[in-house]
Amino acid sequence: MATLFDLPDLVLLEIFSYLPVRDRIRISRVCHRWKRLVDDRWLWRHVDLTLYTMRPKVMWHLLRRYMASRLYSLRMGGYLFSGSQAPQLSPALMRALGQKCPNLKRLCLHVADLSMVPITSLPSTLRTLELHSCEISMIWLQKEQDPTVLPLLECIVLDRVPAFRDEHLQGLTRFRALRSLVLGGTYRVTETGLDASLQELSYLQRLEVLGCTLSADSTLLAISRHLRDVRKIRLTVGGLSAQGLVFLEGMPVLESLCFQGPLITPDMPTPTQIVSSCLTMPKLRVLEVQGLGWEGQEAEKILCKGLPHCIVIVRACPKESMDWWM
């Protein structure tokens, strides 16, 4: 009977890739062959450290021993709600990531206090930066900062970053390579701030505005004014009306449009009105409707029949985050 030890290296590597980092390191002690496999560069391209309370000393060890030039994407957590004595992410650690991991392209930070970590310390190779439930300082993203910071940044996700406000949003305009912006629960951003910032971010190709205090109509108006080259839009339907849909009509290169519930707006456009507006968008190929209770209903049939050239997706809202800090 074949055992785990009889499997070829490629199969074992695939199995090991699903293991948490801690277990990966533990199995390296089983035998010399497994130790060699755990050291394989392929296994350390994408690392998720959010499952653990990762002390800085351990993080430094992982950085020196396993990750280094192999690392392509890193997901890690901080200690934002662990008390003032808890260790925090440091500028030195961020700079070391940049120096020792020249291939790092994606960094996702969760529940981290970045108020003492200047943005200038982040790795300059980043193309994607995600902040989830993080704390930032007032000057973290402001426009007056060094314009050469993160020259390759193409995508930034700001999810439940309570300090993020209009001034930070306007500071994003210095990232000339930026093409994708996701705002989730950034309740301090105003309609005026969004409009002013999008005017200078006219090169964006993807915009998501989810769970903010902005009305969908005002967001669509700002998009129609300034983002004529946008290819993907996703937004919550709060404050969406038929008039708001009119703002999107004729968008020349829009390929994907998503409306996300829950349905709390009294003036929500009918499926027929949505079809009518979508037919004016020559490049539209995907329409997605989430959390409006339309799945399996007449509304879904109207959308599918009215937009035969599109992939129409009608489904329930994605599950709420199960992160303990929420």
Curated annotation (Swiss-Prot):
Keyword Signal attached: no
Record SUPFAM superfamilies: F-box domain (SSF81383), RNI-like (SSF52047)
Domain F-box residues, every copy: 1-47
Keyword flag Repeat: yes
Keywords: Leucine-rich repeat, Repeat, Ubl conjugation pathway
TM region(s), chain numbering: none
Record-linked Gene3D superfamilies: Ribonuclease Inhibitor (3.80.10.10)
UniProt-listed PROSITE patterns: FBOX
Pathway(s) annotated for this protein in UniProt: Protein modification; protein ubiquitination
Oligomer and partners: Interacts with SKP1 and CUL1.
The protein, known as: F-box/LRR-repeat protein 12
Organism lineage: Eukaryota, Metazoa, Chordata, Craniata, Vertebrata
